[in-house]
């Protein structure tokens, strides 16, 4: 009996299953938990298909998404795995990032090959920045012709190349989720082979704390005799007393200053790090020079922009969204991090209007610059009510 010890130090990676409906995403998810449970019973509970299939609903930025989370461990890693029952749930999850993915297992039925949703999921993975993909060629027990395997594999690799994934290098593993779930030892081995490919081909993500410092400003105070304090939750990186920072966004000029104090729960710290709610005391900055919605950053690491392309999902009427479609030149507010900025929407060519419940790409021109990079999430609001959510896919200027 192989024993792997549970270590909190194991690297943690977030993955998910993507692919066309009925190609076996949920069955594969269940099969992975079963095979890993059989191999390392003290580390892994088995999660049956039924439990994954009745995914609980979550609300992310007002959007209702059905999503299942399972956890499991290989010898070297701890995984959190997301699976969504419906195609619409996948699209919503990938755009809102309700469950962030460091990599994905693309499930393609060997009996069908790539189908329309396979394409859509790969395109979305590219647009929302899922960085790595491993392919599971499912239902391989139902194909006995080597030529069919070769053909399907070729199609999948071409599809990945088309969307700028390294299609020629991506591992393609032949599996039968159903047979593995039924306890067939040979097909069980193929699931372990798949997980080995995931271990080796989906790199550990960079932790938030290792990224360059960024803190969105939520509030600004003036403390007599000490200066100006900005408060917020550190999004990434670390900040030390006496670090030089820039304050950018909403205005044309940036401010460069020094952090003379870091406070948390009224205690002075030497350092604040990702996840901490802190107050930063800024040298020589007047209260009226900074405002909510700007960001404090490590100098030169983020720039403000006004024009970008985005992928968005629009709330349906039932989710509390709009009741009517919107058209070109729609002017809602875009809520980035801590503040709303009005923007003008240009719809893609050939799209006349967008209905509640749709997802679409769009170009947005903001009336004030916002510090952003590709992948940044935002909400679309009308008078404080969320009507959609999206993320930046490309910065124009």
Swiss-Prot record:
Disulfide-bond pairs as recorded: none
Region (G2): 62-66
Residues that hold Mg(2+) according to the record: 26
InterPro entries, A to Z: EF-Tu_GTP-bd, EF-Tu_GTPase, EFTu-like_2, EFTU_2, G_TR_CS, P-loop_NTPase, Small_GTP-bd, T_Tr_GTP-bd_dom
Region annotation G5: where it falls in the sequence: 176-178
One of the record's GO molecular function terms: translation elongation factor activity
Chief location: cytoplasm
Alphabetic keyword roster: Cytoplasm, Elongation factor, GTP-binding, Hydrolase, Magnesium, Metal-binding, Nucleotide-binding, Protein biosynthesis
Gene3D superfamilies linked: P-loop containing nucleotide triphosphate hydrolases (3.40.50.300), Translation factors (2.40.30.10)
Positions of the UniProt region annotated as G4: 138-141
Catalytic activity: GTP + H2O = GDP + phosphate + H(+)
PANTHER family linked to this entry: ELONGATION FACTOR TU, MITOCHONDRIAL, ELONGATION FACTOR TU-RELATED
Name used for this protein in its record: Elongation factor Tu
Organism (species): Thermobifida fusca (strain YX)
Lineage per the UniProt record: Bacteria, Bacillati, Actinomycetota, Actinomycetes, Streptosporangiales
Gene: tuf
